[in-house]
């Protein structure tokens, strides 16, 4: 991908390209996503598009990077050290805060769907690795404070927590797709947090 050519595009056209690609990658797997649909949606000529974008892989990486920046402006997870003083009270606050922000954040919603549809992409893998590293650091603070089980191996505990949180995401995604207007996010979060606490608590 030509970063220089992308940077030289008018801001409105850059935004239209990223928005069209984000919608495409969020609604389909990487294999099913169509560059032709993206080109038509953002109303670029094929010659202009391919002057900037050299592959579907580079476009997805670009989209993930932009959505991460936009999502960070809406919500950023706290530093792991913030969990040290009162692990479970902080965990409840973070869970509630994420639940409050997520339904209103277009970037978070799109990024969430892209991650689930394109786990093998390098940009998505990098994001997943950063998330798993954060989870491990958070749990280490919980272990050190005695808030969570210290008998379980730390790596197994982190894997179990990350897997359960991924299951929560998958379940919530199905709920919102099936009944987007009636999904009870508050009740769902209560059920999820209770299960997570049962898994981890000392």
Located regions from the model:
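Hydrophobic alpha-helical connector segments
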Residues: 62, 76-104, 154, 158-161, ...
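N-terminal intrinsically disordered/low-complexity leader segments
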Residues: 1-12, 174
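Helix-turn-helix
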Residues: 16, 24-58, 62
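Short, basic, alpha-helical segments at the C-terminal edge of helix-turn-helix-like DNA-binding modules
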Residues: 64-71
């Amino acid at each position: 991908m030509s970063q220089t050519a992308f940077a030289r595009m008018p801001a409105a056209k850059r935004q239209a390209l990223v928005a069209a690609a984000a919608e495409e990658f969020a609604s389909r797997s990487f294999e099913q996503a169509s560059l032709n649909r993206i080109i038509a949606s953002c109303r670029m000529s094929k010659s202009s598009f391919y002057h900037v974008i050299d592959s579907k892989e580079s476009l997805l990486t670009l989209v993930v990077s932009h959505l991460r920046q936009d999502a960070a402006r809406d919500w950023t997870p706290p530093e792991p050290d913030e969990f040290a003083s009162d692990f479970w009270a902080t965990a409840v606050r973070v869970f509630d805060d994420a639940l409050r922000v997520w339904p209103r954040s277009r970037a978070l919603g799109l990024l969430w769907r892209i991650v689930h549809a394109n786990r093998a992409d390098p940009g998505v893998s990098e994001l997943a690795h950063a998330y798993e590293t954060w989870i491990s650091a958070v749990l280490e603070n919980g272990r050190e404070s005695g808030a969570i089980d210290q008998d379980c191996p730390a790596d197994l505990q982190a894997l179990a927590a990350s897997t359960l949180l991924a299951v929560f995401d998958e379940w919530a995604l199905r709920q919102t797709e099936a009944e987007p207007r009636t999904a009870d996010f508050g009740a769902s979060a209560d059920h999820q947090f209770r299960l997570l606490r049962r898994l981890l608590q000392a």
